[in-house]
Amino acid sequence: MATILLVATATPGHVNPMLVAARLLVGEGHRVLMLCGALFEKGIRQSGAEFVSFSSEVDFDYRALEQHFPERAELSGTAQMALALRRFFAAPIPVHDRKLRALIAEEGVDLLLVENGFYGVLPLLQQARSQRLPILMLGVNPISFSSPDAIFYGPRIAPELRHSLGDLPWLDEQTRRLQAEVQQSFDAALAEAGAPPLAAPFTDVMVTAPDAFLQLSCAGFEYERPELEGLIRHIGPLLPPGIALTPPPWWERLDGRPLVIVSQGTLANVDLGQLLIPAMQGLAGDEVQLLLTTGGRDPALLGPSIPANAIVTDHVPFELALPRAAVLVTNGGYGSVQAALAHGVPLVVAGTGEDKAEVATRVAWSGVGINLHSNEPTAEAVAAAVRKVVHKPRYRARARLLADEMGRLDARAAIREAVTRLLARAC
């Protein structure tokens, strides 16, 4: 069996699918190591993989990003994403590259399995495939590839609509400047690592340079882009294995009313007033049941006035709750959206930071939900969107179509096949 090194950016949305992959590969008999932040050591060891920590100077705590990057609190949307790309993703590349190369040499690594948000692999990807070990990429974010209207994480205008818009300018000057600054940051980090500058946008290299790219979604959630044909394979979401779960204490309080799950995820949840509180206030008098999760934060942060139709908890096991849900209200975390769609649950999405605007755009484009186009929607806006999704069957019908498409895919089998093929090619 082979020695396989997994690497993931140290945030839950990036790590969780990689833990499923780690458990899968350990079960296949491979020796599996996983390089990640120290916060995730326990989960990595529980998967059966050997844990290796990021170097301390680039091991950021995702729960306190404003402490690492104080200016983040003053930014939103594209500007916040640009800051994250420069400081959180690009700047650590030289340190990550040194760690990767040392591990590969010391541990005799045969294959590198990376999620597409870990840019520390770019120096290795700059090498010819014949001069490096095989690299398999897992897509845990919206597909990121340049286009005339792309803002870091892909087009916000469905490709089929572009022709009807004629020669209208796609991006404003400020956005173009941000993109140029981010690309320069990646080139500077690569130069520090001793690698040449990128010959294409950094997002494109992460798609074209790996030996294989597996996207954890279905084609129905992504725009049709002929230029990506043959580069990306959609394999469906990589959800945790089905196990018997002990229902949480609040489970017995669920009744027959439509269940509305509301989550700000585990990253953008410092201010619960962005989504949880507006949803709670806007739907307090509705004939629905609210299940509000603070994503690990103290539920007391929502205050003492909790409506009678609401349940507040710091964690919701999606695999248990989503089959009962009428709608998921979220700020657009890619993994949460894929989990909802796998269960045929429609969505209301309110995120604009990180890659969440791209997720929200795809939710609306694919017909599986409503994009609120705001990081801080009003109570009225959230309530109106939830009522529309709950009472208009077309959203659930579209979500069920994507669930059927996902049901025909097998992410685990696809990963096994890709790993076997790449290892055989390397021999």
Feature names for model-found ranges:
Residues 3-10, 18-33, 43-50, 103-106, ...:
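Nucleotide-activated sugar donor-binding and catalytic core shared by glycosyltransferases
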Residues 67-123, 167-204, 208:
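Conserved nucleotide-sugar donor-binding subdomain of glycosyltransferases
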Residues 20-21, 121-127, 274-278:
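A short acidic, amphipathic alpha-helical/loop segment
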Residues 15, 40-41, 120-123, 337:
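Short, well-ordered alpha-helical microsegments
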Residues 33-81, 165-166:
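Conserved nucleotide-sugar phosphate-binding/catalytic loop shared by glycosyltransferases and other
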Residues 89-169, 215, 220-222:
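Conserved nucleotide-sugar donor-interacting segment of glycosyltransferase catalytic cores
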Residues 41-42, 58-62, 141-148, 356-358, ...:
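Short gly/pro/ser/thr-enriched loop/turn and capping motifs at secondary-structure boundaries
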Residues 217-327:
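Donor-nucleotide binding loops and adjacent catalytic segments primarily
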